[in-house]
Amino acid sequence: KDGLKWTPVKSAVTDDLWAITFAKNQFVAVGADGTVITSSDGYNWTKTAALSPGQTLKNIVYGYRDNDYFMTQGYFMTISKNGDTYKSHDGVTWEKENMKFASNISSVIYANELFIAVGTNGRIMTSPIGFGEWLSWLDRYSQTTENLYSITYGGGRYVSVGANGTIMISDDLSRWTIVDSGTKSDLSAAAYGRGKFIVVGLDGTILTSSDGRTWSPAAKK
């Protein structure tokens, strides 16, 4: 409840779990072998789906427009040119969708009524619809060919991070600027909270920034 003290609970599965979100009064987590589990309280979990054997679901995001859905983007653990994308209204019943370049996506977020996806070779795509109309995804010019692993939004600014210390910022998703991260380590995740961006990566890298443009290593205790 405070983020400091944690209690182990049984998840109802033995598969590795990769991502979790909370919406519509429930937690939904996804992981290896297409596993989807749900919980209303975080203590008691139920396996609701096995979307595709041998497939790892690495990301899940919730967004709302005309219709609200959970969306989880699947990534094959083996080398493949194809990726599977699923949508769900309730987190229990899932429908497979066709999404071009899905296998190249690393992360998806929902911000400002847009689904925003980042992936290999600097790919950034946005969609104002997201569900049922996958051809509406628009490629954005990102200024880099480095693989992108994560994106976040806060304080009126988008921040995307990736391989070799790549950090890019944008206020409108159309014009991106590469900024100096001060590291060459791969950066795997970005988040925003309490007026600050936080980025983490390999070799124990933790960076913080108040504006997304100037970054400093976090103090180690």
What is each PLM-predicted segment?
Residues 1-221:
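Residue-level hotspots at or immediately adjacent to binding/recognition sites across diverse folds
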